[in-house]
């Protein structure tokens, strides 16, 4: 995902059945239907596998594997056994939510995942967590506009935009990206976006994303 100097953005499209914020996916009951509809517009896919709050299941990833693009396992990963599961289910990347993990946990779990050949997306919402992870090598960093403790959207992406040059890691923006804010957000320095609800709700938004300049995908199943 080395696109900071390319003038283009990378996009990760997310499949989920529901969310703790109240979203319900009514357009794509079949994950493979969403994969087919959105494949040409994105660089990678994120699959919600967390069952309690998001109705996720690992079987949902099967329809995306044949698209030959990187797959991110989206869950509250806090144990190595969960990373083993991601590896065994042919995911390419895991998510670590730094707001809920200690510094030692992030280092330990990310190191374990990378030793298996997996990429690691470490997201944060609270600014002090960025200070913790910005110097860790070999990560993808994500700023989540949603406060996961309150589930409220508290986007401070303009402020976070000023921090991007403090790290050499790819830096993406997550949550609440839609047709109302994408043009403004696209002027910021983020390397890419993780987009879920907007692409599941609005099929026209897929084409809008492409028109804004998705980085060309080369077929290699890696974010780097």
Explain the meaning of each model-derived region:
Residues 140-179:
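Glycine/small-residue-rich hydrophobic helix-like segments
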Residues 85-105, 142-152, 188-209:
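Glycine-rich phosphate-binding active-site loops on the catalytic face of alpha/beta enzymes
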Residues 12-14, 46, 95, 142, ...:
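Structural motif
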Residues 15, 49, 98, 145, ...:
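Short secondary-structure boundary segments
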Residues 71, 78-90, 126-137, 165-166, ...:
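Catalytic cores of alpha/beta
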Residues 1-71, 78-81, 118-139, 148-156, ...:
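Conserved N-terminal beta1-alpha1 strand-loop-helix module at the mouth
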Residues 70-101, 106-126:
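Hydrophobic, well-ordered secondary-structure scaffolds
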Residues 64, 106-110, 163:
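Aromatic/hydrophobic pocket-lining residues that form π-stacking "cages" and hydrophobic walls in ligand
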